[in-house]
């Protein structure tokens, strides 16, 4: 029995669901009035909490009275870089009209019939379990960073009969001897909503980027497979020319879609990659300074998922680069000897267009590929080593 072939809506479910966690509805799904109001209130609370936390953090940095050791300096450096990274990605996904437009174009192009979906092997391009687990682990490790302090406080209460009132971020100062408990609860609520805004913006934007890139890659593979399977002949030249004309049009359309994708995500992609590398560096150094603690353990998991996050963006960027070039190879290997001159002219058009590689790029000039990932990790390692030497 053939497995059920995934629809376009099935692909969209993961990125849409992730953004729902912070109350942001990317595709404008119809909702009841009461549900719309609840979403709006929750969205407002996340943004307001984020604004308050960033404001307090900036105040503490300007005041500079409470940042009195290397560990705190690295903690603040981590927070600043992560906020820049997350806010950059959030600004990107605010281009909702452009994202919805690209989504509609790809939905129209998606294989409609079951046989067509089988031919394009859509199920092979669906979100793998390992990717879904990566997203869950990333969000889970981020949650642990936030709730870790209160867990530590609860453990201290049961082991030493003292609740230590620890919380996540160092820029909120709480004195249990002077301040009422409701302030502690308010601080934790602010930190939770602030973290939700940052974490979901960070991972969610990349999932939308990968979602669109996977769809474009799927269609490039479809072109390559179609060329490999088709055998033209002068005996059915009319049908052959219709076939190859569709391939030419689809190639042009895919280039246009990739340009749309770069137009949405490319402007912020360079800054996102640089700040992600900075986050990895500062978190790694902070974790090494702190030593083996619950916080350190959750940060190690966070670093691992952040590295994988960058790797996947570069991996799919490499894929579209390779696949767009493989279209020309598919034409070279195409059995066109019995085809008409007109058919061969179409093939020449495809080859000429394939000479200009289609790529995921940052700001129009930096191609995102596995080489980018290697360079980024190499620089990150050198920065971590340099920072540790400076501290020691």
UniProtKB/Swiss-Prot annotation:
Q: In which tissues is it expressed?
A: Expressed in olfactory sensory neurons in the antenna.
Pfam family name, one: 7tm_6
Q: Which residues are glycosylated?
A: 69
What keywords sit in the KW lines? Cell membrane, Glycoprotein, Membrane, Olfaction, Receptor, Sensory transduction, Transducer, Transmembrane, Transmembrane helix
Keyword Glycoprotein recorded: yes
Keyword Transmembrane assigned? yes
Superkingdom of the source? Answer: Eukaryota
| CC terms in the record's Gene Ontology section | dendrite membrane; plasma membrane
Span-the-membrane segments of this chain are 37-57, 70-90, 131-151, 180-200, 269-289, 296-316, 364-384
GO MF annotation, one: olfactory receptor activity
Give the membrane topology, semicolon-separated if more than one.
Multi-pass membrane protein
Localization per Swiss-Prot or TrEMBL: Cell membrane
Q: What else is known?
A: The atypical heteromeric and topological design of the odorant receptors appears to be an insect-specific solution for odor recognition, making the OR/Orco complex an attractive target for the development of highly selective insect repellents to disrupt olfactory-mediated host-seeking behaviors of insect disease vectors. Odor-evoked OR currents are independent of known G-protein-coupled second messenger pathways.
Q: How does it assemble?
A: Interacts with Orco. Complexes exist early in the endomembrane system in olfactory sensory neurons (OSNs), coupling these complexes to the conserved ciliary trafficking pathway.
- Entry similarity comment: Belongs to the insect chemoreceptor superfamily. Heteromeric odorant receptor channel (TC 1.A.69) family. Or49a subfamily.
> According to its UniProt entry, what is the function of this protein?
Odorant receptor which mediates acceptance or avoidance behavior, depending on its substrates. The odorant receptor repertoire encodes a large collection of odor stimuli that vary widely in identity, intensity, and duration. May form a complex with Orco to form odorant-sensing units, providing sensitive and prolonged odorant signaling and calcium permeability.
Question: Under which name does UniProt file this protein?
Answer: Odorant receptor 85f
Species lineage: Eukaryota, Metazoa, Ecdysozoa, Arthropoda, Hexapoda
């Amino acid at each position: 029995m053939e497995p059920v072939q995934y629809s376009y809506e099935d692909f969209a479910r993961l990125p849409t669901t992730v953004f729902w966690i912070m109350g942001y509805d990317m595709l404008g799904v119809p909702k009841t009035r009461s549900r719309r109001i609840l979403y709006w209130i929750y969205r407002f609370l996340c943004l307001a909490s984020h604004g308050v936390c960033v404001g307090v953090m900036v105040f503490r940095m300007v005041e500079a009275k409470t940042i009195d050791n290397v560990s705190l300096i690295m903690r603040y450096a981590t927070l600043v870089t992560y906020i820049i990274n997350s806010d950059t990605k959030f600004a990107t996904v605010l281009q909702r009209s452009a994202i919805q437009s690209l989504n509609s174009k790809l939905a129209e192009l998606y294989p409609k019939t079951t046989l067509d979906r089988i031919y394009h092997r859509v199920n092979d391009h669906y979100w793998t379990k390992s990717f879904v687990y990566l997203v869950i682990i990333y969000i889970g490790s981020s949650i642990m960073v936030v709730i870790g302090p209160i867990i530590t406080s609860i453990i201290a209460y049961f082991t030493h009969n003292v609740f230590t009132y620890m919380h996540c971020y160092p820029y909120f100062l709480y004195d249990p001897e002077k301040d009422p408990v409701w302030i502690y609860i308010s601080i934790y609520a602010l930190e939770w909503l602030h973290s939700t805004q940052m974490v979901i913006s960070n991972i969610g934007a990349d999932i939308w980027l990968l979602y669109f890139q996977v769809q474009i890659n799927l269609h490039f593979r479809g072109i390559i497979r179609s060329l490999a399977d088709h055998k033209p002949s002068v005996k059915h030249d009319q049908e052959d020319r219709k076939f190859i004309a569709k391939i030419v049009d689809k190639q042009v359309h895919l280039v246009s879609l990739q340009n749309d994708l770069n137009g949405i995500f490319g402007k912020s992609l360079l800054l996102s990659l640089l700040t992600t590398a900075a986050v990895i560096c500062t978190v790694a150094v902070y974790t090494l300074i702190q030593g083996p603690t619950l916080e350190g353990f959750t940060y190690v998991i966070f670093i691992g998922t952040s590295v994988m996050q960058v790797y996947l963006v570069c991996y799919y960027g490499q894929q579209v680069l390779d696949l767009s070039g493989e279209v020309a190879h598919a034409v070279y290997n195409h059995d066109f000897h019995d085809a008409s001159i007109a058919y061969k002219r179409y093939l020449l058009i495809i080859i000429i267009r394939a000479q200009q590689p289609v790529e995921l790029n940052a700001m129009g000039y930096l191609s995102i590929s596995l080489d980018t990932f290697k360079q980024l990790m190499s620089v990150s390692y050198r920065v971590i080593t340099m920072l540790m030497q400076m501290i020691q």
